[in-house]
Amino acid sequence: MSRRSSRGRGRNKEFKEFLKKNKKMNITIIVLLVIIICSIATYSLIKINQDRKVAIEKDRISMQQSDIFKSANAELESLDDYKSNSLIRISAVGDILCGNNLEKYGMPYDSIFTELKKKLKNTDLTLGTYETDVQDSKSDFATSIKNAGINYVSLAHNHALDYGEEDLNETNEYLNNLGMKTVGKYEESSEKRVKIFEKKGAKIAILAYTYDNGKQGVNIYDEEMVRADLEYANQNSNFSIVMMHWGDVYSSEISEEQKSQAEFLIDNGADIIIGAHPSVVQKMEVVKNKDGQDCYIGYSLGDFTSDFENEDSNLELILNLQVYVDTEGKATLYKVDYTPVYMVDYGKELTDNRFKILDMKAEIANYGEGQNSVTEDIYNKLVRAVDKLNSIIIKQ
């Protein structure tokens, strides 16, 4: 046997032994490759489904905003020749609360409203119900509310006299000194109870009432007083906004009392009704008054600021209204929509910057584009909030 043949057989033997030794390794590599390929495919599928989910949520919010007020906004076509200086832009938020956690861990308070300042300040009038006081650090909270763009607040609520009439008077004076107008503190005459806001040649009357809880100091809803106030408003303004503190807490259902009071207000000249107190969102609608003009009712916009551990209470609406003023000074409801927002609590482990109000539509869009401005947990809360809005606004 030649030396070359012997060497060849030796190499074949070594090669077979190499294959045998590495057989398990090869199988492992193949398995790993299969896992990697499957993972990539699964991730791609999840990403596609996630993108579809985000798109659906964006579309659903847009659908809510466009479907609700078709009857009111249909009149836009007849006003195509309007000029921007003939429109008064009004925004409204719900109850402005400053609970213990928000007071202690929400500082600096300005950071809560970062996403909303431009939206709220780009209006002629921004309304809300100021359901807290200005003691201790709450005075800084009041300043941040003003900085956020809110310039007109109702003091007619069930907690107005929790700390006595002196505290109510101090709150009223402090807010006025900040540059925020107030309404709802009890006065003897309609002339003093009804506040008039003037803009672009129009006068807008602002009225505010709360339900009777056995305390005085603010305007308690009473048909005789309300009728007199609206009569004064109709004689001295072009348009009337009534802020109501009513309804059942934590209920998205409209009570019979709310329906009855809303009908009474519209029949006596109210053009817009803005509701608060339930701490959750309730439905909204556009109805015709006796003259066939559109009137808006927002039964509850929810809590603008709160620290309740309740997802439904963290959901809130910013109402956006446009009032058209013609050359003769007549004012009519021109357009209505809303911005859904959500109050986020970033966790009990934080001692500051714990709370923030998010623009739901913007955050859902950002999440879909890969901008990690919110966590998956917060995103899922926003999705659940969209579901809640859908059940309240579309299906009722």
Pin down the residues of each PLM region.
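N-terminal Lys/Arg-rich, disordered targeting/topogenic segments
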Residues: 1-26
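Acidic, metal/ion-coordinating pockets
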Residues: 26-396
